[in-house]
Amino acid sequence: FIGELSLGRTPNPCVICNRFLKFEQMFKFARDFGCSKVATGHYARVRHGKDGSWSLLKGRDRAKDQSYYLSFLKNSWLSKILFPIGGFEKSEIYKMAQKEGLDFLVGKKQSQDLCFVDDKLRRTFIDKRLRPQSGKILSVDGEALGQHEGSHNYTIGQRKGLDISDGQGPYFVVGFDGDDVIVSRDEKDPSLYSNVVNLRNVNLASLADLDSGASISVMAKIRYQQKLSRAKLTISGKSGKLEFSSPVRAVTKGQIAVFYKGEVCLGGGIIK
């Protein structure tokens, strides 16, 4: 996470954590205890096809669907995973919990992003592990609007916390130039939009393979909260490209793009 920030990227720790920490460690524990499967409380599902294939599916509760965060799971793992609540609405799970006397779980605050660091301590945690480089906050025309204490505190499309007090805002982060942060007053600045998103470290959670250079039509998104948009996916090895039918806003290096076919989460890749 810190390494990605130091390279000027905005990482998604949850996706990487699920792949390399949570599930890998759970499978190790399962083997040690002689268990053949692991179960988690994610709102997602797995499906065993008639042809023997396994697919990762969206959770039934689409508002709480977490397949996005599971897009980097290995396809070979799906046969060993159980998602017992994936076929329920969250409201149904709460009712079950209350019925079993687990009221303390209902309404419990959900962890977001860096679950291992309190939101109030996030900046301190990062600054202790990085050597922040101060720089200027510049308008798209090159006008100096302020100073910052580290470009890692900013991301494409960001509006709040920009430390600009000229009274002319709001401003939006549209890019970086070395240690300088570039902002625009135009929420629809052209530099915020792109039809093409290039990917690295592509993972196919529900596709055992895809012919190199072949293209398929998918629905995709470049962040969890974004609505799915039509796109053409082309994969070559671990690299990929999404060509969206309509421009998508705030394409951010280090974030995860995830692609779907119907309710099947095909996989994802890191935006480069």
Regions found by a protein language model. Name each.
Residues 1-265, 270-272:
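Nucleotide-activated chemistry modules centered on ATP-dependent adenylation/adenylyltransferase
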